[in-house]
């Protein structure tokens, strides 16, 4: 099949891992000769990279698919692809539900997109959901940004949280070698990228599957070791990482983050619940006391560190008192940002089968109460920025105000200020903050520090 002058479109649902996978699959499609189309109705290949963490995201996928399936009856050459976690979970059942589909592929197969599409173009309907070793030879991604980039360091998850479908759809943990991670970062540095976010479902579990151990029995390749190994990559000014699991978040890692100047003082560590009984029912493997100690240790080493997290309300059996324990933890810690969600039963998870499910009304009420507190605490946390000078990495123009540029502080606060994006994109700018909101800042530039060129 000739792919020149043909177009593709990717719609991505869900987490940062999916966004990184979509960038790699876009790179594969462009290597094959396809051009990107913003409008799916003008595309010859439409790929939905899906999320199954919550039911609403899954239902949205089926809605999109229904529209394009109708179009395929009028345009038989249209190629429809479902990738990601819904594809992995449903497999061949997706073909029965949407027979117009050409390719169903789980997240472990993202790097095999070219081979799978060539099979489709040869006339086959393809399902690729079997467990595979993720290919280390990662195709050059089509990055959405020219300033910041994702770099996967570990795929999959070995945890068995009772509410979560991720281990079922993303497979067991597979760490990339330190050499492969550094090589990708070096290439990004040569291309002019300034900030790297290292990605993993449980990134602080990195290296447990790699060979070797220290004489003390510690894994030879921990995430802390990886940070030291990649920290001096030329051209890279900032390093972030996500997502961390409290079970593996050590003082050694915290100390490394405090010592390494490129590592940003921002930590995303989901706690899910502030009640020990619920944490045990969730099989999270820690207590709320341990979580508090982690945050206390971070703030001891880095008093101004930004903390973000995830929380679930309405987990099966959650009492009002248990929910209030979550509110207390949020009130005590004071998160800079908190991603909240009402519990959504997911197929194949233990908690979905439990009889003590809460009503949608109760879940909605608790979510609203939690979100109110989150906004109050975030606004309180923002006050510390007023009048301060913050280093901002400029990423893009403010879409709502063409006279402003936008970027993020080291603590991950979205920040706006007057400026020309053509002059400032990719630059580190000292900004004096004169306006604060719960989740963003506004200021005036006072100094531009030219980022190091390589």
From Swiss-Prot:
Domain of life: Bacteria
UniProt EC number: 2.8.4.3
Top-level class of the enzyme under EC nomenclature: transferase
Any one cellular-component term (Gene Ontology): cytoplasm
Residues annotated as domain MTTase N-terminal: 6-122
Entry note: cofactor: Binds 2 [4Fe-4S] clusters. One cluster is coordinated with 3 cysteines and an exchangeable S-adenosyl-L-methionine.
Chain positions recorded as [4Fe-4S] cluster 2 binding sites: 157, 161, 164
Cofactors (names): [4Fe-4S] cluster
Residue ranges constituting the Radical SAM core domain according to the UniProt record: 143-380
Sequence positions that bind [4Fe-4S] cluster 1: 15, 51, 85
Molecular function per GO: 4 iron, 4 sulfur cluster binding; metal ion binding; methylthiotransferase activity
Binding partners and assembly: Monomer.
UniProt similarity note: Belongs to the methylthiotransferase family. MiaB subfamily.
Protein name: tRNA-2-methylthio-N(6)-dimethylallyladenosine synthase
Organism phylogeny: Bacteria, Bacillati, Cyanobacteriota, Cyanophyceae, Nostocales
